[in-house]
Amino acid sequence: MDLLRSLPLGLYLEQPQTWLHKLDPRVKFIWLMSFLTSYSFANNLWRILLVALLILFTLIARIPRRVWQQQMGWLLTLSFFVLAIAAISPDGLGVDYQSRLPTNPQVLTQSANTNNSATATEQLKSSKSYTYVLFHKGPVKVTRRSLDLAVRISTIIFTVIYSTNLYLLTTAPEEITAGVESLMQPLRRFKIPVTEITLTLTLSLRFIPLVLEEVQNLVRSVMTRAINWKKLGLKGAVKVWMIVAERLLENLLLRASQMASAMMVRGFTSPNEHRVPWHDLRLKLRDWLAIASLTIFWGIRVVFGNQI
């Protein structure tokens, strides 16, 4: 169960402070949304480019290898596994291959002159260069559609998970809250409780490590008791894990109650009366450079990344 601690899901890396840490959280949030939204209606080349950009950002930022190596390795392994499974799976299309006779009836009645013969020869050569089935050996068959679906699924898994984790890794929960609250300021005109939403977001981000720690401790306690799972059988094993899940829920509710008590002791009554001083958000030169890069990013996406 050391996997929970070795994979820093939703955890903030305090040291070392990289250039990604120093960017404005609002700029990083817009970059994150760009990664998640530019994927839609994009071609496969753009989807692969997003994966390459995420890996490149991680390497350029000089994030310690111990932080990202195992998680990126697991995600890449999962993505390649999904790619392989989806590529050899049926594509769901009952494709009719090229018919023996031309579909246009006029071709049968045309006179066989030299120009028509040359045109037909060129069309025949071009049609032979295209193959719908890319690989077929025994029960394994890879088609163009199955490969396209495999690339879509595998890249979106890596992009969604790793881009979100990279954002949480380089942005403190308080910075995320301040950035989201700043971006949501126009919603106050519609009487939307922006402060309550951002406070809930902060507490949720702070609660993620506690959940991982509780799961880690409970599973370790079960493993150290040397339970004979074969004697218990399926019904007994399910009963044990139901007890563990019940205990986990009790511990999480206890942690939440302790957090609420700590806020009450500190005089917290409501978000509007107890203002928490978040970070002073000001755009600097590096933030404007990131915004300019974002403009170039979307320009390339619109010109070259559209799905054909």
Swiss-Prot record:
Domain of life: Bacteria
Compartments where located: Membrane
Keyword Membrane tagged: yes
Membrane topology: Multi-pass membrane protein
Primary site of residence: membrane
InterPro entries xref list: ABC/ECF_trnsptr_transmembrane (IPR003339)
Cellular component per GO, a single term: plasma membrane
Protein keywords: Membrane, Transmembrane, Transmembrane helix
Pfam families: CbiQ
Regions crossing the membrane: 41-61, 75-95, 153-173, 192-212, 288-308
Family statement drawn from the similarity comment of this UniProt entry: Belongs to the ycf92 family.
Protein name: Ycf92-like protein
Organism: Nostoc sp. (strain PCC 7120 / SAG 25.82 / UTEX 2576)
